[in-house]
Amino acid sequence: MINIRKTHPLMKIINNAFIDLPAPSNISSWWNFGSLLGICLILQILTGLFLAMHYTSDTMTAFSSVTHICRDVNYGWIIRYMHANGASMFFICLFLHVGRGLYYGSYIFLETWNVGVVLLFATMATAFMGYVLPWGQMSFWGATVITNLLSAIPYIGTNLVEWIWGGFSVDKATLTRFFAFHFIFPFIIVALAMVHLLFLHETGSNNPTGISSDADKIPFHPYYTIKDALGALLLILALMLLVLFAPDLLGDPDNYTPANPLNTPPHIKPEWYFLFAYAILRSIPNELGGVLALVLSILILVLMPLLHTSKQRSTMFRPISQCMFWILVADLLTLTWIGGQPVEHPYIIIGQLASIMYFLLILVLMPMASTIENNLPKW
């Protein structure tokens, strides 16, 4: 009998990607985050679709339409909070996924890595535009501050900002276009994720040792389907705990005040997952310099394959590089904390030191550590 999953044109693609895919036998739970990100994306698209059915992208009604969703729509509150906290879960998974890639040298797969960086940028843009939609105080002022950064671009800056705004300030036109973009972007992310997977399946997965696993492969199903199912269960458990017990834990109280262009909130800050980049932006006194540092803080990931000086791929057997990696993690946590603090002493200097440390670690200290480790056996 001919097996349909191996012959049918559509089933064949699914089979080769999720069923008969040869996978390394030793990939740990750090390899679960790819599938978890897929689940997050599907969840965000579904909850977002139902929210869009009741949301109105007009400055006069946006805030009240979100209130209406929470109060009057059947299970609207749970859909809204699953969407808001789903974004946080998405970014937790993203950061862990990227961190895994850095630790185990997954960036050696150039195409997969670069598409991943584009995915990160697209997700950040989508999340930013989504944060503007409820039209609360932090939505409005966050949009104003972040879009205004583009005015630092020489010569075309001001025109560019007004073009994005669709006027001379963040207003109705801005909200409408942000809603349109926020709706379309997740589908672009789906397409990019498929390209990401396509490139990954060209090379096969990396594994914790960083050594070729061609000699020891196992089928993806049932081994990793069951492992991913457990990961999904834990992800949904964590999300529902957040949604049902502390839905506003990661949000900003200011966003429960309708947007008012005449009243600036005391501390304008983005959602927690952007705070590290926001801290880097604020740590540089010059506006253009700050914007460049902000972009470079993410774009620097593209340089990772070029900065890889070690003879080994993974940091599994490289203790000095491991120390550097965990110092980088601590530094990013410090930046996240600083991004949420007011601009005053001692936070300013801590932010500046942490920002310098961030770039120093990636550009200088980590490649140096690798070079030292390469030469250690000679000593």
Swiss-Prot record:
Binding-site residues, a ubiquinone: H201
GO BP of this protein: mitochondrial electron transport, ubiquinol to cytochrome c
Record-annotated disulphide pairs: none
InterPro entries found in the cross-reference section: Cyt_b/b6_C (IPR005798), Cyt_b/b6_C_sf (IPR036150), Cyt_b/b6_N (IPR005797), Cytb/b6-like_sf (IPR027387), Cytochrome_b (IPR030689), Cytochrome_b_C_euk/bac (IPR048260), Cytochrome_b_N_euk/bac (IPR048259), Di-haem_cyt_TM (IPR016174)
Binding annotation for heme b b562: H83, H182
Keywords: Electron transport, Heme, Iron, Membrane, Metal-binding, Mitochondrion, Mitochondrion inner membrane, Respiratory chain, Transmembrane, Transmembrane helix, Transport, Ubiquinone
Compartments, record wording: Mitochondrion inner membrane
Cofactor note: Binds 2 heme b groups non-covalently.
Membrane topology (UniProt): Multi-pass membrane protein
Transmembrane stretches, start-end: 33-53, 77-98, 113-133, 178-198, 226-246, 288-308, 320-340, 347-367
Cofactors required: heme b
Principal location: mitochondrion
GO CC annotations on file: mitochondrial inner membrane; respiratory chain complex III
Residues holding heme b b566: H97, H196
Gene Ontology terms for molecular function: metal ion binding; ubiquinol-cytochrome-c reductase activity
Family affiliation: Belongs to the cytochrome b family.
The protein's role, per its UniProt record: Component of the ubiquinol-cytochrome c reductase complex (complex III or cytochrome b-c1 complex) that is part of the mitochondrial respiratory chain. The b-c1 complex mediates electron transfer from ubiquinol to cytochrome c. Contributes to the generation of a proton gradient across the mitochondrial membrane that is then used for ATP synthesis.
Binding partners and assembly: The cytochrome bc1 complex contains 11 subunits: 3 respiratory subunits (MT-CYB, CYC1 and UQCRFS1), 2 core proteins (UQCRC1 and UQCRC2) and 6 low-molecular weight proteins (UQCRH/QCR6, UQCRB/QCR7, UQCRQ/QCR8, UQCR10/QCR9, UQCR11/QCR10 and a cleavage product of UQCRFS1). This cytochrome bc1 complex then forms a dimer.
Additional facts recorded: Heme 1 (or BL or b562) is low-potential and absorbs at about 562 nm, and heme 2 (or BH or b566) is high-potential and absorbs at about 566 nm.
Protein name in the entry: Cytochrome b
Organism: Damaliscus lunatus
Lineage: Eukaryota, Metazoa, Chordata, Craniata, Vertebrata
